[in-house]
Amino acid sequence: MTETSTEKLQYTGRFHQFGIYLRKFLRMFVYQSDWVVLPIGAVIAALVTFVVGNNMFVTQEGTTMGTFALTCVCVWNGFFNSIQVVCRERDIVKKEHRAGMHITSYILAHMAYQLILCFLQTLITLLICHVAGVHFPKPGVITKWGIVDMGITILLVTYAADIMALMVSCLVRNTTIAMTVMPFLLIYQLIFSGNFFDLGAADFIKVTTISHWGSDSLCVIGRYNEQPMVSLWNTLVQFKDADFYGEKPLLYVLQAVEKNGMLNDFLKWSGQNNLKPAYEAIPANVLPAWGAILLMIVIFTAVAVIALKFIDKDKR
């Protein structure tokens, strides 16, 4: 028996078939180098985190940029985990379905296996964030520990992206199409999250993206509204030499602020005038986001099961 085929389906029950397929996927993790997604994900997380990690959860700008970048890492990891796992063995799935395989057992086994992968990737990502000097939020919003809230969010985002890619893998017929579709899914998640681009009349689309809910959750957990804002000060510094009727009023003001040790007070004041209700550190801003991500997981799972239910009729 090769690792691309399952054990003989001597059990007709869904639970027993679930165990058979889960063991198969675990063997493939070892013998077919599926473990490679872990170091690849770690490298991507390291590249991003070492660039934006120092200011994440320190300033409002750093938190916005850092959480969005971290969410993108999670989405990428999730997509890469499962975008090819079904379509690469589509013929085998079709054959075994005709022999009595339960599609629900097969999909749930994939989901259990992918959950293990996503959990490991979450631990690796948190470790890399720690090494990169990320200042984890100490008090949590949902739990007592901010790092736990952060870990739950990272796991949910990664897993939702993973199951979305699993759904796509069930819909397409080969790995070439799957890898062609994946960049478009990534672009959709990045652009339509609403975090960096003004969507205008299309703003309602952001609620359909995993990245939107993930970034918002991390900003809430990171206590965005309690952090200083530095962009106003940096803008004023750029214009410090601006001449106004032979005077440089901004330069005098900036020098006075620094001389009197009021810079930190100014940055905190700037932050307090840039509060966002959606980022207030309360459970009501986190739990709905987690719920939205879980709902997406349920929808992706349902579509994946339905798609494979009709695999016998697939003439492609």
PLM regions with names:
Residues 1-12:
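Non-transmembrane, juxtamembrane loop and terminal tail segments
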Residues 10, 19, 26-316:
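Membrane-spanning alpha-helical segments of multipass transporters and channels
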